[in-house]
């Protein structure tokens, strides 16, 4: 299948479907592509094309994810859909498919179910900023009061996990009717309403280049007569020659000045998000900087050791541990470019964590790391990945 040219003319937003098994996530994904392709161009995808999600690897974990794209009048969307619950958990925790917003699919016939709740909680923990609800299978419910009841339940559940339940758009429809070409309010019209909600309710994400400058340190060299050069890939923002920057993590924060930016052995006056650069630092000694630290705009990110996280523990089949771990387990946490040892505190009443589980934990690292909510990490033992996680809340 040939790759279509990626249209850059419209702003780009990443979304995905979440929700309980068999509530219609994949059917809805197919319906969105077919209705919007007919209206705005693009490719309609059939249910089985999406359901046969290819395997991909993220942070050493194999995940099945289907990627589709579609356009509305104003935007271009990349949309992820996962075949199984475990794939959602892994996807959201590793950040393999970052979501600027999620479409929560709830069957009107069943109402919220255990995975509905779990996916909302995961969305909160991993920092999915916006949720829109598609109340599916409404053609199977004749009772308007019942629909209202289900809608109320969903809003309460969103509130419980700190999403704005009252103001969340909830669209009533039937993905199946839309797939069958039904032009009525439950069919294509519901899909168009959903598209409008995506456009109006999910704001455009901040582009990496607009963020505060941040570059994880990959390597450090000393160049005689010129000073210390730090190399890495700029994660966000822009660094200009002459700007003050901080070196954050592992040791006390230090201030320094960028006196040069190099890319492919050429001198530049700035480096920006996505660039692999060498940054020359004024008056900084080679031994003052190490892998695992970050260079950043002063004050934009702080070093921390204590945080809550949401983790997925690899199963034995995925090359993970063969045995459970217990409270105070001390693996290495791999942040950006380095490992830091930390101790895990399990939630109250949870005795142990089995391979294949996902769980909320509290971590204390032995060295501080430049950290903010949403930062991803791997959990390793002797260089082998045994889990993946994301910082949910910084404690200290």
Curated annotation (Swiss-Prot):
Stretches the record annotates as G1 = 19-26
Does the record carry Cytoplasm as a key word? yes
Broad class of the protein's primary localization: cytoplasm
Tell me which residues bind Mg(2+): 26
Indicate which residues the UniProt annotation says bind GTP. Answer: 19-26, 81-85, 136-139
GO annotations of cellular component type: cytosol
Q: Name one GO molecular function term.
A: GTPase activity
Give the E.C. number(s).
Answer: 3.6.5.3
Residue ranges, annotated region (G4): 136-139
Q: Which reaction does it catalyse?
A: GTP + H2O = GDP + phosphate + H(+)
Membrane-crossing ranges are none
Q: Where are the residues of the annotated region G2? A: 60-64
Which parts of the sequence are annotated with region: G3? Answer: 81-84
Stretches the record annotates as G5: 174-176
Q: What does this protein do?
A: GTP hydrolase that promotes the GTP-dependent binding of aminoacyl-tRNA to the A-site of ribosomes during protein biosynthesis.
PANTHER family under this entry? ELONGATION FACTOR TU, MITOCHONDRIAL, ELONGATION FACTOR TU-RELATED
Family of the protein in this entry: Belongs to the TRAFAC class translation factor GTPase superfamily. Classic translation factor GTPase family. EF-Tu/EF-1A subfamily.
Record-given protein name:
Elongation factor Tu 2
